[in-house]
């Protein structure tokens, strides 16, 4: 099942998500979240982005597409899938700026989002088993971005204040449009 992705302006994106306690439906939910993420051409998707206040996200590592081949569906390029519930970052090292976008802010990016270069994350998998991962570089950035979603934080809020204000000003029209679309979707969902 492909879920509609909640856009900037939807209140669920601004709330701290509740811990996952019942894992009985998480595997199926994660499959649907992955399908939704692939449809949107993303690398990660947090439960609040589909309207669920749960501390859960999915993320994938993609293999590089071989040169000269026809473009393949993203699903065929997956190297590793992560299903992450109740994550806690227990260690951070280094600080690097990098480019980020978000499926809840489609088409908007910032090249200067500061994140830890290396992290250690403790979490539970789709069956509730405890796991520990050490990540660096791009996947460390993806995990930090998705964990922020679980805390009601959007990527541009990580920018230093002057850059954040410049981002908001430069993208004002798009942000207003997202807010209108978010309200329309909420209205549609409440009537359906």
UniProtKB/Swiss-Prot annotation:
Cofactor(s) required, per the database record: Fe(2+)
Signal peptide interval: none
Catalytic activity: N-terminal N-formyl-L-methionyl-[peptide] + H2O = N-terminal L-methionyl-[peptide] + formate
CDD domains associated with the record: Pep_deformylase (cd00487)
Recorded GO MF terms: metal ion binding; peptide deformylase activity
Biological processes, Gene Ontology terms: co-translational protein modification; translation
Keyword DNA-binding: no
UniProt key word Protein biosynthesis: yes
InterPro entries given in the database record: Peptide_deformylase, Peptide_deformylase_sf
Similarity comment text for this entry: Belongs to the polypeptide deformylase family.
Name of the molecule in the record: Peptide deformylase
Organism field: Thermus thermophilus
